[in-house]
Design a protein with these regions (language model features):
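Short boundary segments that mark the start of a structured unit
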Residues: 1-346
Length: 346
């Protein structure tokens, strides 16, 4: 016989459920890696634990790589890596190292969040200043969208200290294409400033020539030193030119100071006389630049073709004399040689 009477069943729910036990904590750690293609397997030890490296370095202009990894209570990477963390850039806590400047020495804007288990990079910036090695920190915070039950960031392994390596300052260091900042005497074009000299290539006898010395970058832009920089220019007579022709002596060294104006100047005064000597020549050449330690590489022995107007380390100037003549009109105000004769010429 079938009982057709209705039956009422009540399912009782626990409004204060017991806390689940035996749940393993998941920690998120930050690891420095060597390249963008590094996998978690590459940084796993033979016993299955994660190899945690909390420092890295790159030459100025290079890239630094990092990865946030989820690990179990034994420090072993989980099979599933997921979630998002925020990237924070900071300074080193000790005074022993020099801090890099965010936005100037490295790009702190490209990566501000990252996926757990995915490599991210920070690009450093190359320049011509000799700043020494500089440090900054990369730290993960604010874990979100995590698939794990009890995840948290391991605050003992949440930070990597990164170092940007810089070249030591030098004069006429070797410039190579794609050169990076290392401890060797090899420099890239971004590391180098060039000392150049400009001035008139002709002057009439009795005239004065002003020469300008300055520092420029690889594109010809003026570089203004924060420290006064002395450039040595050597004056040399050519051919029959002698000390009677200018106010300089042969092989005289001239100290030219480049200041906050971005340039230094000096003059050569030519002497007017009555001898018809034909044209005479002299040369002024950069022969040394003071190493103030401000720039990585100051170069004056060669120049790249990226600098406009054919830069040079020397100028040869021709002193133009009057052609010998008889009974030519004399300018009582003091003619400068060329087409007018002065009392000194007559």
């Amino acid at each position: 016989v079938t009982n057709t009477d209705p039956v009422t069943t009540t399912i009782k729910d626990n409004t204060t459920p017991n806390t689940e036990t035996n749940v393993e904590d998941v920690k998120i750690v930050l690891v420095a890696v060597s390249s963008a293609t590094t996998t978690i397997a590459d940084i796993t030890n033979s016993d299955g634990t994660l190899k945690v490296t909390n420092t890295n370095e790159t030459p100025e202009g290079g890239k630094l790589y990092y990865i946030a990894v989820a690990v179990d209570k034994d420090g072993k990477p989980l099979a599933t890596q997921d979630g998002d963390v925020t990237i924070n850039y900071g300074t080193t806590p000790t005074a022993s190292g020099k801090d890099a400047t965010a936005g100037v020495d490295y790009d702190n804007t490209t990566t501000i969040t990252t996926k757990v288990g995915v490599v991210f990079e920070v690009e450093t910036k190359d320049d011509y200043y000799a700043e020494g090695d500089e440090n900054f920190t990369v730290k993960i915070t604010d874990l979100k969208n995590s698939p794990y039950e009890t995840p948290s960031i391991d605050t003992t392994k949440d930070t990597v200290t990164s170092t940007i390596k810089d070249n030591a300052p030098t004069i006429n260091g070797t410039v190579v294409s794609g050169g990076e900042d290392t401890n060797s005497n090899t420099y890239g074009s971004e590391d180098t400033v060039y000392a150049i000299i400009t001035g008139e290539t002709t002057v009439n006898e009795g005239g004065v020539v002003t020469y300008t010395v300055k520092l420029v970058d690889k594109d010809g832009n003026t570089v203004i030193p924060t420290k006064e920089t002395t450039v040595t220019v050597t004056y040399t007579n050519i051919g029959t030119t002698s000390t009677d022709d200018t106010n300089k002596t042969n092989n005289q060294e001239i100290a030219v100071k480049i200041d906050a104006s971005g340039k230094g100047t000096f003059t050569v005064e030519t002497k007017d006389d009555y001898y018809a000597e034909a044209d005479e020549n002299y040369n002024v050449k950069i022969t040394n630049v003071q190493n103030t330690g401000e720039f990585e590489n100051v170069k004056f022995d060669s120049y790249p073709n990226t600098i406009p107007n054919s830069p040079s380390n020397n100028v040869t100037t021709t002193i133009v004399d009057n052609v010998a003549t008889n009974n030519h009109e004399v300018d009582s105000d003091g003619g400068v040689d060329g087409t007018v004769y002065g009392k000194e010429d007559t």
